[in-house]
Amino acid sequence: MASSPPKKTLNSQSSSLSRPPQAVKFGRRTSSGRIVSLSRDDDMDVSGDYSGQNDYINYTVLMPPTPDNQPAGSSGSTSESKGDANRGGGGGDGPKMGNKLERRLSVMKSNNKSMLLRSQTGDFDHNRWLFESKGKYGIGNAFWSEEDDTYDGGVSKSDFLDKPWKPLTRKVQIPAKILSPYRLLIVIRLVIVFFFLWWRITNPNEDAMWLWGLSIVCEIWFAFSWILDILPKLNPINRATDLAALHDKFEQPSPSNPTGRSDLPGVDVFVSTADPEKEPPLVTANTLLSILAVDYPIEKLSAYISDDGGAILTFEAMAEAVRFAEYWVPFCRKHDIEPRNPDSYFSIKKDPTKNKKRQDFVKDRRWIKREYDEFKVRINGLPEQIKKRAEQFNMREELKEKRIAREKNGGVLPPDGVEVVKATWMADGTHWPGTWFEPKPDHSKGDHAGILQIMSKVPDLEPVMGGPNEGALDFTGIDIRVPMFAYVSREKRPGFDHNKKAGAMNGMVRASAILSNGAFILNLDCDHYIYNSKAIKEGMCFMMDRGGDRICYIQFPQRFEGIDPSDRYANHNTVFFDGNMRALDGLQGPVYVGTGCMFRRYALYGFNPPRANEYSGVFGQEKAPAMHVRTQSQASQTSQASDLESDTQPLNDDPDLGLPKKFGNSTMFTDTIPVAEYQGRPLADHMSVKNGRPPGALLLPRPPLDAPTVAEAIAVISCWYEDNTEWGDRIGWIYGSVTEDVVTGYRMHNRGWRSVYCITKRDAFRGTAPINLTDRLHQVLRWATGSVEIFFSKNNAMFATRRLKFLQRVAYLNVGIYPFTSIFLVVYCFLPALCLFSGKFIVQSLDIHFLSYLLCITVTLTLISLLEVKWSGIGLEEWWRNEQFWLIGGTSAHLAAVVQGLLKVIAGIEISFTLTSKASGEDEDDIFADLYIVKWTGLFIMPLTIIIVNLVAIVIGASRTIYSVIPQWGKLMGGIFFSLWVLTHMYPFAKGLMGRRGKVPTIVYVWSGLVSITVSLLWITISPPDDVSGSGGISV
């Protein structure tokens, strides 16, 4: 219970005053503690220089009654007014002073009433506290008395003085000097492209209609694709968070929270993995350690790992990680370590002692480094240890079975021998319930029981301080608690569709709801660790800010380590993460990209946003009342309630809530839904905060886990639980696409939710990306395949509801359409070669109109790109790498995805592109060795063909010009220019085929020879050898 300040009985005369109390509006605390009024006759704009200063505060002072039981400034004699003014420290004549008091101290007549009310929270009355104690007052100033400045509990009264209400986040608009020209150039280029296409259509090339037709179709599609891509970029914004304000609101002593215990909501962190052979357990363990050591209230944090393969190797690696976390987590807190992934921390090249103040840091770091090296040895030795254990137990079982068989068969073994199942064993001598090394029925990747193990229990509510340990670290005064951690592997059985990663995530959503029920869920891949220990708090600033209850998720940018310095294949993808995503943040929000995303649990459950307001307009910023679909229970309400639009969506008004057909038959799970919704609300500490919760509502301890709770959590991850429910259809991660992340985010936006893009000063998360060309192309192939699936499904943005904003709809439409650009891109890459082969061109002649349009389009595109680079903060080299890989991926992976999608939709045929050969790196110590490995795949065929065809075309074009009677060198250069444009974009691809030191695989020579012969035969057919007198290239 919060202790209250001493109370005294108010004068009955003062309580009977009919007029509202007068108050000082605005003040500034001086160095001596005195607060000076800054009120003036005119209203002060608090949004200027004063609003952000810590020494300016809003406060309300109740003015005591005058001796005749009338408030100051009421009607009375002049002498009384003057006397009262003089006693307050003022001067001047009576009537003048009385009028000034009315102007300066009256709150009810001020237009800044909201400024005063916004700092009043709860039922705590600072006015009564001030004037029922020994506080002093005066005209234009107020201060606390020096004596008795604390009350029972030892908290200073000044700590509870009304402070200015501070938002937790703010929008940082792109400067108009950058954004306005950017928008203007987009409009100008749009007009130029329109007139260029009109000119191209009305001026066909009669000499080569087939070239003209192919080119004009491609150019129209490119214009359409460019519009889809550029329109969502019209309103980019930046955002900033205020972690100090978050700390003051949720973790500082207050009247509702006198102990300063954290009032932040709970967060559940999900880590997903499936195969320890492809995703090394050491990498997953380091990710887990970075989560357990994150800077967030320990009792509010829970971590879960979803092992969809049910591997004992992952299970025991996580157990080892939890044991190491007992030292690693307090070490990070003691010395404020960043990053808190031990492998990344010990790999940092800079001085580790920088900014470290504790004298025992070097000793502690040396000790924990030695412990981590031993931890790595144990993790790396787990596969062999588990196999040896299995062999020992299996041998024991075999001897046991033979002994039993001899006893039953008269002392001899049966003729058929004794069969003993080669099982995988746990350390306690029991069978591993998951996947065995030698798969058997009930023990394979697609057929095993559900597993749930609480490896780290629910921490105590109060901090547990460590002490000095001989031979270990000194954790005196350091909280040594570790957040709760659970290993989860859902049940899998033949005949059930497990829906890959999306199904595993939904299983964790249900299990975590029963075990911890964090109001927010952070989703990470096993190779993405927390690089910024305050990342969760950064995201919480948006969720807990005014209007945060309408945010469904916070998407963080993906940052990668281990990328080659030149970023040959655009692995950093900064154009997308710093450009496109930042622009979408100015609309309805960024798309969900699969990792580094913090969800509102309530939004994952398929509910609409809490306030039924729809936004219209180009940028989705204009509010308009939404169209409500009222149920019978809502229609039966009183007319008064019908006329008044509710700001929230009451859970008990949803007729489907809790029904098995929607969420399943677990009542324990459905009971957690309203709790998660309530805990995810922002604080109601401002008059403009709607659907908020009172301060101090989340201070109660979490109950310990008991056997029935764990049993229920196991039940909700069973393979049959989702049967006849809406999981995967409207609830949780959505099924039916290999890019379930994009579809899941789309469904939330389609219901009216908003998302936010959070770019932190220090990267929030970091992960790994494939630097090998083949692996990179297969990654892009998976993304593009998912986009094609979206285009041919009900998740196409063309079928979205009106809650999806216009430009957001355009962005999602582009997500489904962009792979189809590959068809036209491939054709356009062959056009320069076809022009050189045929001696024709896409236009009748290179006249002034064509060259002028080409120049204007090129200049405007360059200027738009430069301004985009400016507001997004990406580098020119990054932009160029992205352009290069756009062409490489567009002519390979995107084209393959379109072929796959069309065959699947039209004929029901599924084609997969897999690796056919692998090579190993020559230098295992080279971290970029994988960059030089050449793994042949069918995705190489089209880009390789484009390169060879254009090279041969240049040779043929040059030969025709050299041996012609009248060489046309200028025309040849014009034809070669477009081929070189293609080849320049293909340079990283060609360099990747060379491998290390230019070693080209034999298969590349084979394909080059085949393509060259084919092209030569084609040229001979088109242009017979005896025609050597023609001009070489383009006819003018």
From Swiss-Prot:
Q: What class of enzyme is it?
A: transferase
Molecular function, one GO term: cellulose synthase (UDP-forming) activity
* Localisation: Golgi apparatus membrane
Q: Does the keyword Transcription regulation apply?
A: no
Q: Which UniProt keywords apply?
A: Cell wall biogenesis/degradation, Glycosyltransferase, Golgi apparatus, Membrane, Transferase, Transmembrane, Transmembrane helix
List all membrane-crossing ranges: 178-198, 208-228, 817-837, 848-868, 895-915, 938-958, 962-982, 1002-1022
Q: Which organism is it from?
A: Arabidopsis thaliana (Mouse-ear cress)
What protein name applies here? Answer: Cellulose synthase-like protein D1
What are the annotated GO cellular component locations?
Golgi membrane
Q: Which gene encodes it?
A: CSLD1
Q: What is its main location?
A: Golgi
Q: Name one GO biological process term.
A: pollen germination
Instruction: Report biased composition (Low complexity) as residue ranges.
Output: 631-642
Gene3D superfamilies attached here? Answer: Spore Coat Polysaccharide Biosynthesis Protein SpsA, Chain A
